Amino acid sequence: MNAPAKFSTSQIRSDFLAFFEGKGHTIVPSAPLVPGNDPTLLFTNSGMVQFKDVFLGAEKRSYVRAADVQRCLRAGGKHNDLDSVGYTARHHTFFEMLGNWSFGDYFKKDAIAWAWELLTQVWKLPADRLLVTVYHTDEEAFALWRDVIGIPESRIVRIGDNKGAPYASDNFWQMADTGPCGPCTEIFFDHGDHIAGGPPGSPDEDGDRFIEIWNLVFMQFDRQPDGTLVPLPAPCVDTGMGLERLAAILQHVHTNYEIDLFQTLIGKAGSLTGVADLENKSLRVIADHIRACSFLIVDGVLPSNEGRGYVLRRIIRRALRHGWMLGVRQPFFSKMVPTLVELMGEAYPELVVAKDTVARALSAEEERFAETLDAGMKIFDEVASRSQDIIPGADAFRLYDTYGFPVDLTADIARERGMRVDMEGFEFAMERQRETARAAGKFGGGVALPADLVASMSPTVFLGYEAYDADALKVVAILRQGRPVERAEAGDEVIVFTDRTPFYAESGGQVGDSGQLSGPGVSVEVADTQKFAGQFHGHVGRISEGALALGDVLAGEIDTQRRGKTILNHSATHLLHAALREVLGTHVQQKGSLVAPDRLRFDFSHFQPITADELAVIERKVNAEVRTNHGVEVHNMAMQEALDFGAMALFGEKYGENVRVLKMGGYSTELCGGTHVTRTGDIGLFKITSEGGVSSGVRRIEAVTGQGALDYVADEERRLLEAANLLGGNTTEVVDKVRALTERQKRLERELESLKAKLASGATADLGARAIDVAGVKVVAVRLEGFDAKALRDAMDRLKQQLGDSVIVLAGASGGKVALVAGVNGSPTGKVKAGELLGHIASQIGGKGGGRPDLAQGGGEDGPALATALDGVPLWVKQHLG
């Protein structure tokens, strides 16, 4: 029998897409690893994720046949293969899924025939090495395989309900407990009887001989709440085939790590780590993880301590720890990126575009973890040496909290040593920390609308895009002290709901409007407007006169000056977001914002501080767009239409079917429900006031606009002029004069240190003569005026060299405070401990201190007690020497 031809991973991708394009399929790009249409899903973990709404009938596409190569991730959440990666033949964090789809078009006959054609005619797989499974009641699929394809019945396996319930089977697919579902047929490759394992459905099915390569799902039923299956009017096909395991078969190897793509990555990892054994499991881990980490960063995820960012951090740190195991102590992981780009850049052009961003983000994380990895491993070794088979949860939490060790990394290390982590104890420690954080962060609780009130109201109609005031606003609900009332009186603090309103309710980072509601004999001062249950505008304020009742008709007028300042800042936020992505890279994603009348605050993903030069460029770009005076266009459209229009959606946000798109020239196009200027020139001036870190991987910029920016610049000029006057020059000389002052200060500090050293040297010579002999040990306990802790330590070092076996206590007094240093040198070290001695002295002068057996330091209050404490040192030493 002739061996099948070999195919490269790249060729397999292109063959698959070309084959189905020839069958009338639209080739669809891979969706990002971060699902845009499913907030319940951490990552895209299968090919069907981007088509989920199509199958559910919530979305229409312009095609009925599609094919794609989808990048997928399984690490975190329900689908998590992280612990197995590197140790098994076919587990990966990142993998590619080949898929073809029919949305009410072709069905079983074509799907099966085309799968067989591609496998046996294009890729030349021997038909006698292929075996298929069908759901036990799917007679149609069974007959197609037997009668049309010609597979003997002996190689068609019926799989029943093998998961303990009706339709709970490896060969019956369902999206949820109800909804689209149907049988599937799977194609397996037989590696031969030299490998252990039996066919699917047999007791030995978990062996490695028969490997599933393609799953064809036939969605033909709608499962009802009572469990019955109703035929769908337009059945669909959803197929999935793992690229890596298919490549292993087409390249005549048994494990995925032996295919061309992985062999190149493993070779690069070996070169960077100095490991020649390419079978090393740590090299496999590194090769796998570079794909997952790189594509997560491409898709906008950066390392952080929560959500998707924390999953990325866990994967990176697992790879770094495996590098550490191989003896690597220098950055190496980010150096894998160019090789990955060479291998996968043609298939994924977005990787090529983001390669520098990926490398910088990985490098920054390497540097961050390197600071704690060695120390953390020492702590782990200490814990492991005093534990039996279990790493206590409290210690695992300390490794996580102090040294940045994700708990699954600690579990990984423990497993390698035949141990396990007390996960219950770890979760207890985590929850205790969460409770502490919650307690520290508690403030006045929010108000929730009663369910019956929500059911009785219609969503508030917002008029504020076009109008700053409005009449005929009907009061539909009043809350007083958080409870619905029919009437409220003057002086009452209330939340008023009307059927319509010009007041913007706080959302999307923009603060709510303030202003006034008024009617015959009643006035409400509105301090804020909040959104309740996502659709009702609540006017938060106080009744200043009269009484308010349900059904009253009011007029509303917002504070136009406050709104006017706010819209400048909101529109500037959009320009800032675009400028950040242009200057820093497309990895920048909004992580939070505040748009207030007096300032804007914008939080975004970025892995390092922004330089002064970068900030200057960002500010210039925003102001250039302001001066261009773009018209600001507003478009209302369907979500998919908005994305096709180029609108940027925020990761993690859930949008409705129809969205509002804000476009500023060709520079910024975003989904936004806020209020904005009509032209960018209205912003006037944009000025950044600060930049800093919020958390790991998240930066913050604060800025002002319009008159606020002019006032800020005027204040800066005033301060600069004041500084120039203090320095005795003009504003152009400030930098030079400050530089000269700084250099002079440094010179004086060096001279001062030199004088202190000479003083300490002279004092040391005198102190040696004052030493008292206690049982053959020289004891010195003295007060030194004006000595700081450093000068005391220098004097201590000289005295130890001069005296040999000795116990020394030095007290530096200055400004009513005392710095203490205690040292033990030579023979008394075992009996006299510096930390205990210093603690004994400090306790007598209202202070504290401690340290090592040979050196300790502390402090306290100056006064008569210090002399008494120092005088008692020789006796204390004598008692401890025995």
UniProtKB/Swiss-Prot annotation:
It is an enzyme of class 6 (ligase). GO terms for biological process: alanyl-tRNA aminoacylation; negative regulation of DNA-templated transcription. It comes from the Bacteria. It holds the Pfam family tRNA-synt_2c. Signal peptide: none annotated. Keywords: Aminoacyl-tRNA synthetase, ATP-binding, Cytoplasm, Ligase, Metal-binding, Nucleotide-binding, Protein biosynthesis, RNA-binding, tRNA-binding, Zinc. This is Alanine--tRNA ligase.
